[in-house]
Amino acid sequence: MAEVQQNSGNSNGENIIPPEDVAKFLPKTVDEGGWEKCWEDGVTPWDQGRATPLVVHLVESSSLPLGRGLVPGCGGGHDVVAMASPERYVVGLDISESALEKAAETYGSSPKAKYFTFVKEDFFTWRPNELFDLIFDYVVFCAIEPETRPAWAKAMYELLKPDGELITLMYPITDHDGGPPYKVAVSTYEDVLVPVGFKAVSIEENPYSIATRKGKEKLARWKKIN
C-alpha cells in the first residue's frame, strides 16, 4: 500500500492552480532566486501536498519495476515515499535544500524511512556509483528551459540501467506561452528521447489526473533500445 502524506491545502488536488495560470507568475520568483526561493517563500503551486494519484495507482497495481528508483525534482518527497518499499529503494533528488528539509521533516519518521533517501544534487551533473532500474519524471522536463531538454534526455539515458524503465508523466500538454511550467507535447519528448536511444513502449492518457490537470497529461513508458 502506498504511503500518502496529505496537507490541508491540497489534500485532494482541487486547489492546485492550472499550469497556464502558474506560468503567469512563477517565472518571477524563479528569476529572482531560483527553485530554492520558491521553496523558501512557499511558492510551490505544483506541489499537490500528497503523492501523485497516478503513482499511487502504479504502486498499488504492482506496475512499477523493482530495484533502484529515482525521482528527480522530488520536492516535498511525496512520490519518493509512495514508491519506496523493501523491494524498491528510491532516491529523491532536488537542487533545493529547503525542499529536501521539508521532505525530511514530513517523512523522516516514516516506517518506510530505510527504503528511501533524499539527495541534494544537480540532476544534469550528478552521476552516482549505481544506476537505476526506474526513473520517474513529472516536473523536471516542464520546468527547464526548452533548449535544455536534450541534456535532460542524455542524463536520463546515463542514469538508467540498460534494462531499466523511464516513466514520464507528460505535463502540461497545453498551448500557453512562457513558463515554467513550459508547455509540452508528445513530440517534444520524442524529439529528445528517441535520438539518445529510447523507445516509447506505451503512451496513454492519465485517468488519475487531478481536476485542474485533466486532459493535460499523458503517461509514457520508455525503454532503452541501444
UniProtKB/Swiss-Prot annotation:
The protein's enzyme class: transferase
Entry function: S-adenosyl-L-methionine-dependent methyltransferase. Probably involved in glucosinolate metabolism and defense against phytopathogens. Highly reactive to thiocyanate (NCS(-)) derived from myrosinase-mediated hydrolysis of glucosinolates upon tissue damage. Also accepts halid ions as substrates.
Residues where Phosphoserine is found: 85
Listed name of the protein: Probable thiocyanate methyltransferase 2
Sequence positions that bind S-adenosyl-L-methionine: 35, 39, 46, 73, 94, 122-123, 138
Family matches, as InterPro entries: SAM-dependent_MTases_sf, TPMT
The organism of origin for this protein: Brassica oleracea (Wild cabbage)
Any one Gene Ontology BP term: methylation
Family according to the record: Belongs to the class I-like SAM-binding methyltransferase superfamily. TPMT family.
